[in-house]
Structure formats: structure tokens, C-alpha cells
UniProtKB/Swiss-Prot annotation:
Keywords: Signal. Residues 1-21 form the signal peptide. It comes from the Eukaryota. GO terms for cellular component: mitochondrion. This is Uncharacterized protein C23H4.05c.
Length: 97
């Protein structure tokens, strides 16, 4: 696996969900993210992934509902983002199955 540029950032993003509150906006990075993550379990957190739009900005923002549920990890971290299975995220937001 390539560990430079966006690829390295993706691994940090998937392994440490608490950092993802810096990236709570949905962006057009869907395909690049999952091109690096497909078929892998980068770290032992059940492949948690943070998505959602921050309302209010920064750490104080709250994610808008995208008909997704809060995972138990969300409550444990008490951070303003959704953590869901990346396969579900891919299906719902990337439209690639």
C-alpha cells in the first residue's frame, strides 16, 4: 500500500476517528478514500468511520442527520460526528455498492 499523500491521510483518518472532527464535511474524496480502504482492516476499531456535516463549525459543531444512526463509539468519544461501517458509508454516499 502506498503511504504517501492522500493514502497516508486516509489511514490516519480511519484509525483515529477523533481526528475526523477536523474533516466533518462531506467532500468529493469518496472514491479516493475507498480506493485505499477496500478489502483492508487498517486498525482494530471495527473500521469506524466519521461522516456528517458540521453545523456551527469546529469541535462545537453537530452533524446533520443523514438518516444514519449514532454508533456506540460516538457516545464514548462524545465527538461531533457519526461513526459507521465504511461499507455502509460507501453504499449510502458513494453509490458504488
Amino acid at each position: 500500500m502506498l503511504l504517501h499523500g492522500l493514502g497516508r491521510m486516509n489511514i490516519i483518518f480511519i484509525c483515529f476517528p477523533s481526528l475526523a472532527c477536523l474533516l466533518t464535511s462531506r467532500t468529493p474524496l469518496c472514491a479516493p478514500l475507498f480506493s485505499h480502504l477496500d478489502g483492508m482492516t487498517p486498525c482494530p476499531i471495527d473500521c469506524g468511520f466519521a461522516v456528517g456535516r458540521s453545523r456551527g463549525g469546529g469541535f462545537g459543531g453537530k452533524p446533520e442527520s443523514n438518516s444514519l444512526h449514532y454508533d456506540t463509539m460516538h457516545k464514548q468519544h462524545a465527538m461531533p460526528f457519526f461513526i459507521i461501517n465504511p461499507t455502509e458509508w460507501k453504499r449510502n454516499f458513494c453509490n458504488t455498492g
